[in-house]
């Protein structure tokens, strides 16, 4: 069995406890306008362009048959959706400025990468985190990878939107030690507007997890996106929903990530902000926490 993997990040300290290896799987059913990993949204393998590697030799344009690569305003642009001989273009690029955004990997191939970090997992309950994209979109591969990790005694975690059938989640639960579940927007209207899908399935899955013995595995997360998720109404709305199920749930408020903007240049897409916002200050993060407290939650984690 193989899966579509767009990155494996070693020595990660932001995707769970301790030192972790984070495996990023391609494909996501959500289309969040602020997506932190836009290269992982499409399930298809697509070309990406690294401008900092480019020597502007224009070999890619010469090898392009269907204008998949063009020059506009003295800048190289790629058009990933065009039917193009991408493998030839990539092979001819002398600096690796154009590359594919992912590769097919077997469970064993991924495990070979994971084992390189295994000796570090003993410090601080480290292990493997499967992220994306949305790993539940490739749930069969995710399940086999989790099983392989557990066979080797490796702590496992998943970062997920929970936008999947409940039966899929049940398939993975026996092999998960930690579940980081995104709850981005409280209202159906806002969720449809900013992510393109309803939040009802997500809310139902959160309820299922928090009403069973699995609730201690769960940390609910909300990324703070200016003018979208980082509002009093939204944070209080999420907190009230969670409080109505399990008031002691762990709820993490994630700071805005300004580094995501650079990834949009790789795939030749516009970012949702004309001017990239800055990180929220500690004072602002504490205010977000206070709004969650007003909504009835007690166990709140702030990412500064």
Question: Positions of the model-derived regions?
Answer:
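Auxiliary Fe-S-binding modules of radical SAM enzymes
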Residues: 2-17, 215, 226-304
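N-terminal pre-triad scaffold of radical SAM enzymes
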Residues: 5-59, 76-85
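Iron-sulfur cluster-binding cysteine motifs and their immediate structural context
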Residues: 33-40, 59-77, 87-103
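Conserved dinucleotide-binding and phosphotransfer motif residues
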Residues: 96, 148-152, 295
């Amino acid at each position: 069995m193989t899966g579509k993997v767009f990155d494996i990040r070693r020595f990660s300290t932001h995707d769970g406890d301790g030192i972790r290896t984070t495996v990023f799987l391609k494909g996501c059913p959500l289309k969040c306008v602020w997506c932190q990993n836009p290269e992982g949204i499409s399930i298809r393998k697509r070309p990406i362009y690294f401008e900092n590697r480019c020597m502007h030799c224009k070999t890619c344009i010469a090898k392009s048959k269907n204008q998949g690569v063009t020059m506009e305003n003295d800048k190289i642009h790629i058009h990933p959706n065009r039917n193009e001989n991408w493998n030839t273009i990539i092979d001819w690029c002398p600096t690796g400025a154009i590359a594919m955004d992912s590769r097919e990997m077997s469970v064993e191939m991924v495990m070979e990468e994971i084992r390189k970090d295994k000796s570090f997992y003993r410090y601080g309950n480290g292990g493997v985190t499967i992220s994306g994209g949305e790993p539940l979109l490739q749930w069969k591969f995710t399940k086999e990878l989790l099983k392989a990790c557990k066979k080797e005694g490796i702590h496992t975690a998943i970062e997920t939107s929970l936008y999947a059938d409940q039966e899929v989640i049940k398939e993975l639960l026996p092999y998960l030690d930690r579940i980081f579940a995104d709850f981005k927007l409280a209202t159906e209207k806002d969720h449809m507007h900013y992510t393109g899908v309803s939040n009802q399935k997500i809310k139902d899955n959160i309820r299922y997890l928090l009403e069973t013995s699995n609730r201690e595995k769960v940390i609910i997360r909300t990324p703070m996106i200016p003018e979208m998720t980082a509002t009093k109404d939204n944070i209080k709305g999420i907190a009230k929903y969670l409080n109505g199920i399990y008031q002691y749930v762990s709820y993490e408020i994630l700071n805005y990530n300004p580094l995501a903007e650079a990834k949009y240049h790789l795939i030749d897409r516009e970012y949702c902000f004309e001017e990239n916002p800055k990180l929220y200050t500690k004072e602002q993060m504490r205010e977000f926490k206070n709004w969650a407290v007003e909504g009835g939650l007690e166990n709140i984690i702030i990412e500064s």
